Amino acid sequence: MGEAEKFHYIYSCDLDINVQLKIGSLEGKREQKSYKAVLEDPMLKFSGLYQETCSDLYVTCQVFAEGKPLALPVRTSYKPFSTRWNWNEWLKLPVKYPDLPRNAQVALTIWDVYGPGRAVPVGGTTVSLFGKYGMFRQGMHDLKVWPNVEADGSEPTRTPGRTSSTLSEDQMSRLAKLTKAHRQGHMVKVDWLDRLTFREIEMINESEKRSSNFMYLMVEFRCVKCDDKEYGIVYYEKDGDESSPILTSFELVKVPDPQMSMENLVESKHHKLARSLRSGPSDHDLKPNATTRDQLNIIVSYPPTKQLTYEEQDLVWKFRYYLTNQEKALTKFLKCVNWDLPQEAKQALELLGKWKPMDVEDSLELLSSHYTNPTVRRYAVARLRQADDEDLLMYLLQLVQALKYENFDDIKNGLEPTKKDSQASVSESLSSSGVSSADIDSSQIITNPLPPVASPPPASKSKEVSDGENLEQDLCTFLISRACKNSTLANYLYWYVIVECEDQDTQQRDPKTHEMYLNVMRRFSQALLKGDKSVRVMRSLLAAQQTFVDRLVHLMKAVQRESGNRKKKNERLQALLGDNEKMNLSDVELIPLPLEPQVKIRGIIPETATLFKSALMPAQLFFKTEDGGKYPVIFKHGDDLRQDQLILQIISLMDKLLRKENLDLKLTPYKVLATSTKHGFMQFIQSVPVAEVLDTEGSIQNFFRKYAPSETGPNGISAEVMDTYVKSCAGYCVITYILGVGDRHLDNLLLTKTGKLFHIDFGYILGRDPKPLPPPMKLNKEMVEGMGGTQSEQYQEFRKQCYTAFLHLRRYSNLILNLFSLMVDANIPDIALEPDKTVKKVQDKFRLDLSDEEAVHYMQSLIDESVHALFAAVVEQIHKFAQYWRK
């Protein structure tokens, strides 16, 4: 008999340890009571059943035999829940294996709070500890929860956890038995097939649970292992035939805690004593010892999302004077402050001015919703003033979102009283964006183009601050002030704010925020109007841009209304563009292109305009530039580009950060600008989808050999082109992994003749993917073969570039996390789904818990998993067939 066919077991009477049971998760929905029940018992409104999030349930566990309890019940520790109930906690029962009778069963009751000092059962379930053959249960079990009753420990029980009363439960029971047989070695184990099978079983179980009217509690029983061998626990009782007396049980008395959820007076007193003014002089000269210093360094290195414990907060406060020389420690110190205590807040603000100035990138954290003190926020703005315009432009999208956390009254008070004689010069520049005249005072928005005066001022990179500026500026004043000095900043600030003003969702859901953005636009318009001649030119050019975009939107609507096929729509598009009397788009006065204001355009070339083959039919347009050249763009109407705009901004930022570390990965961060929630511009890059390359040329290497041949290069390809391809593959693999970009297929991977590979279409981010079981990164067999295969030097270089890029970006993780934290309230689809988890999703991809060496090994495993992902290859073929039949 082989080793695998042997059955290893141990008698229950010989296992002198306590029984342990793991409480996993609770699946299913709780039904709310009827209105009649609420009227009869008003306390129901204050129960966990009516909380917006998952109520704070707890589970009690007690062992019974013959209807009598064998020990006192144990319960799970307190744990708050947000979206699902998941305790994931091992309970040590006060009974040992030798003390268990053959008919022992465990009763599990789920409880919810019901007013002060009261609890009601959510449901109960009971399961025997030994199976029908006397084997102690092992592994995970899904137990049916009987609603609104306590678990019944009698025999037979009224709350059985293992039943097969329905067809779906028969299916779950059958799969559980098969899983058990596999675990016990009764089936042949095939690793790759087992992984797919267990995932499918898990999906079936989840589906059956959702379709059921019951809730299910997942529990896990301990497995016994010795020398890597799994042992079954068989019931056996020495001298079992001899009779023995049974102890009588007493009624258990539950003692409610009246102080639960109330203020802990001891902790409050300790907090006030630790932060009192008397401790200030003594704390001033405190120096930590080596152990405490290491602990402080660990706290300072925490990511922005890390919540400090009370002990850590007290430690940071105690050594606050020592930490004033560490700029990275400031945000951690401010998290320790209780701003509701005036004396403590006063101490913190006094120390803020003495702290070593923090980096500009770190100051973004102080503009998030977690920091509401106006002095702290203005300190962050003061640090932002040290950033040059180029850096400020990289954060501008997030800074516009950070206005949501400013004091709205301060923004409104910054408006100047309007004069009647200025009303004649205003226009309805926002009318096409969906903002009605009732919402906007027409004298306070961007005006019609003024007579041309002089060219706008060039972009400035100066860090100096003029003497006339107020050092106590709020964020709104700061952004407007800087925008008035830089035409590029003014351009993007205008369009970012316009989109927020036009957002109908914000207008309906949060009218105060909508009104705030309108006030920002009014203040911006006033500031431009008050400026000198060059600043007023900026204002007129912005109005001209708005007029140009309005006409373009009107044109696209007319084309979409045109009946017929794409050819007829193309003809209609070109005809309308050529009609200067109706549209006036082909020949306009020189204006900056909203997408890239450094490019000055004179109009659109009608004969080159065309529509793409897609549902929304975006238009490819060629703009005539100031120097007589062409600038190709894609104008999309009917699509919200804000998500693409965010991802391309982050990719552009990452490219800049990597270049700062002397790592050029040949990325292609093309420009995207949403001019509304329904339309916007995208830069057009001449390229070919990888799917088309494979169809026409057979392989990526054939494509390169066709356009960049070389007798001396690798595989007959120019060495420069191959190097560009390898680096761009590495860059986008790492970046799309960090951002959780989904729906990756060969049609949204594009390739240029110079070897640059880049991604488009970012409709799924932060881990969302319409395809099942997606690989961690898009790296398929065809892409690897384009490098020469897994044994080639180019592939090894690709892996090295991935490791290097990942390590560099990890060092800038705080900046990236701060930028995402400012976007949590933006109406971006994949962020709006779970805004509270957005930053955590990105942080998890960085694996900040690993050392650099461990991070390299982790990236190695991700690459290997992606290259050998079998299911992803199957999905790619399905997508290919779908595209074929669509055509």
Swiss-Prot record:
Q: Where is the composition biased (Low complexity)?
A: 423-444
Phosphothreonine PTM sites in chain numbering: T163
Q: Which reaction does it catalyse?
A: a 1,2-diacyl-sn-glycero-3-phospho-(1D-myo-inositol) + ATP = a 1,2-diacyl-sn-glycero-3-phospho-(1D-myo-inositol-3-phosphate) + ADP + H(+)
InterPro entries on file: ARM-type_fold, C2_domain_sf, Kinase-like_dom_sf, PI3/4_kinase_cat_dom, PI3/4_kinase_cat_sf, PI3/4_kinase_CS, PI3K-type_C2_dom, PI3K_accessory_dom
- UniProt KW Protein transport keyword: no
Protein localization = Midbody; Late endosome; Cytoplasmic vesicle, Autophagosome
Q: What EC number is given for this enzyme?
A: 2.7.1.137
| Named cofactor requirement(s) | Mn(2+)
Q: Which UniProt keywords apply?
A: ATP-binding, Autophagy, Cell cycle, Cell division, Cytoplasmic vesicle, Endosome, Kinase, Lipid metabolism, Manganese, Nucleotide-binding, Phosphoprotein, Transferase, Ubl conjugation
Where does the sequence pass through the membrane?
A: none
Q: Where is this region: Catalytic loop?
A: 740-748
Polar residues bias (residue ranges): 156-170
Q: Is Ubl conjugation tagged as a keyword?
A: yes
Q: Where is this region: Disordered?
A: 149-170, 416-467
UniProt cross-references to SUPFAM superfamilies, sorted A to Z: ARM repeat, C2 domain (Calcium/lipid-binding domain, CaLB), Protein kinase-like (PK-like)
Span of domain PI3K/PI4K catalytic: 605-871
Q: Where is this region: G-loop?
A: 611-617
What GO MF annotations does this protein's record show?
Answer: 1-phosphatidylinositol-3-kinase activity; ATP binding; phosphatidylinositol kinase activity; protein kinase activity
Top-level taxon of the source organism: Eukaryota
- Output the Pfam families linked to this UniProt entry: PI3_PI4_kinase (PF00454), PI3K_C2 (PF00792), PI3Ka (PF00613)
Q: Where is the PIK helical domain?
A: 283-520
Residues that bear Phosphoserine: S165, S244, S261, S282
Q: What residues does the C2 PI3K-type domain cover?
A: 35-184
* Assembly behavior: Component of the PI3K (PI3KC3/PI3K-III/class III phosphatidylinositol 3-kinase) complex the core of which is composed of the catalytic subunit PIK3C3, the regulatory subunit PIK3R4 and BECN1 associating with additional regulatory/auxiliary subunits to form alternative complex forms. Alternative complex forms containing a fourth regulatory subunit in a mutually exclusive manner are: the PI3K complex I (PI3KC3-C1) containing ATG14, and the PI3K complex II (PI3KC3-C2) containing UVRAG.
What family is it from? Belongs to the PI3/PI4-kinase family.
What is the name of the protein in this document? Answer: Phosphatidylinositol 3-kinase catalytic subunit type 3
Q: Which organism is it from?
A: Rattus norvegicus (Rat)
Taxonomy-wise, where does this protein's organism fall, top ranks first?
Eukaryota, Metazoa, Chordata, Craniata, Vertebrata
